[in-house]
């Protein structure tokens, strides 16, 4: 409600009745314990959610019956940089480092390990599935929707990862290597039996979806399902389709494909901004997506994958009239001649007289893309006559790997040059002084 320390998670039944599902404000007396993520078992009967105490990266994973909200006692501690992936209703995979001794800030983070926790057993008996032999900072595992395979990703940085798999249908199966280097980003999107759909930036800086069979995983056997384009690809799956989310100049557009790579449709979004979602199980007939921009509060829509039609499902009640404001995207020139996008938002009728108080925001690091999103704090700023500008600096992920690399290491100065040039543009165009 804007006054609480933590956001509250609700659920809604088919009749539209809402109830609180998880309220992180009740996790601690001082409100500093937050919800760090949650994952449901395949049938939705169980949920594992992570909590972070006092902002720590070390988390606890708590298991709860979804229907009754009864905690069942399988609390896992000392978990860090981890998701949770269920295998049937029997247990789940998670990742962590060795338990820290003394100060948690000094704990080593070069031996990330993947474990399997079987429900109703002690954590100390959890099986080590992968890791511990070679220094790896980030290890994660995900169970395929058909629950036949466990796919394992291992990395030493935020770019590039190894890839492995384990056949869960065979009790004595060994982990098999698919990719043994960190040269590219490789993420399993889905599988149809032994046919794998992989998202990769191998020979495709903006990413593509390729297919191959587990019996012939070598790169020379990869075939394009969704080829690389000039825009960065971020795909999802649901209802038996692949939804290719692209970012063009930091804003979203979505294409729907079948599993043969045939275009079904370009999805009509509510406007220019940021869309996310379109994910779900293959059996689902209705999918959901969110949409927001700098003047539109995040709204959830339903989507019919057969017709392409969408409708508002949940719209927040915010005392803010979006129609009174506008966002304008410009492209300014940085020190070395590179064109950099920036979105400037302000109240309609604002005079460009160089006297407007202005917030200029940028990031330019870690492959993070700054896409349009609504903020109450920014809304208050706009209501009071302020200008809000977001520059998409190099070092981010707005234009893929090349854009990211252009703001790292020996090229880090480009990030600062881009930010300075953004400020100079705002002054030159009389937004501020």
Where are these regions (language model features)?
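Beta-propeller folds
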Residues: 1-270, 276-286, 292-298, 302-307, ...
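Serine-hydrolase catalytic core recognition
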Residues: 147, 276-433
């Amino acid at each position: 409600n804007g006054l609480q320390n933590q956001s509250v998670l609700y659920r809604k039944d088919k009749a539209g009745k809402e109830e609180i599902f998880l309220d992180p404000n009740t996790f601690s007396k001082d409100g500093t314990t937050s919800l760090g993520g949650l994952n449901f078992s395949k049938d939705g009967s169980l949920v594992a959610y992570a909590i972070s105490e006092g902002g720590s990266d070390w988390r606890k994973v708590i298991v709860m019956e979804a229907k009754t909200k009864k905690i069942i006692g399988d609390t896992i501690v000392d978990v860090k940089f981890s998701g949770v992936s269920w295998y049937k209703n029997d247990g789940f995979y998670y990742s962590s480092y060795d338990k820290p001794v003394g100060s948690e800030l000094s704990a080593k983070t070069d031996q990330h390990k993947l474990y399997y926790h079987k429900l109703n057993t002690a954590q100390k008996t959890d099986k080590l599935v992968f890791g511990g032999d070679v220094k790896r900072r980030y290890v994660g595992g995900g169970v395929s929707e058909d629950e036949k395979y466990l796919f394992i990703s291992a990395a030493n940085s935020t770019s590039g990862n190894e890839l492995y798999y384990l056949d869960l249908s065979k009790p004595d199966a060994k982990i098999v290597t698919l990719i043994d280097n960190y040269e590219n980003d490789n993420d399993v999107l889905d599988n149809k039996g032994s046919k794998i759909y992989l998202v990769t930036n191998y020979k495709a800086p903006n990413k593509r979806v390729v297919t191959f069979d587990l019996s012939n995983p070598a790169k020379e056997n990869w075939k394009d399902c969704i080829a690389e384009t000039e825009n960065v690809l971020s795909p999802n799956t649901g209802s038996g389709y692949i939804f290719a989310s692209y970012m063009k100049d930091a804003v979203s557009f979505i294409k729907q494909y079948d599993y043969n790579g045939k275009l079904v449709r370009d999805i009509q979004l509510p406007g220019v901004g940021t869309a996310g979602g379109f994910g779900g199980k293959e059996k689902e007939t209705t999918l959901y997506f969110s949409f927001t921009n700098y003047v539109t509060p995040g709204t959830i829509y339903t989507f019919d994958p057969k017709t392409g039609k969408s409708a508002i499902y949940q719209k927040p009640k915010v005392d803010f009239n979006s129609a009174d404001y506008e966002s304008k995207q410009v492209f300014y020139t940085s020190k070395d001649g590179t064109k950099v996008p920036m979105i400037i938002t302000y109240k309609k009728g604002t005079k460009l007289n160089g006297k407007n108080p202005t917030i200029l925001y940028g990031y330019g690091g870690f492959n993070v893309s700054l896409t349009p999103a609504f903020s109450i704090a920014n809304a208050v700023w706009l209501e009071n006559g302020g200008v809000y500008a977001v520059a998409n600096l190099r070092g981010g992920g707005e234009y893929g790997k090349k854009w990211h690399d252009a703001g790292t290491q020996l090229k880090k100065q480009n990030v600062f040059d881009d930010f300075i040039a953004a400020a100079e543009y705002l002054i030159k165009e009389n937004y501020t002084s």
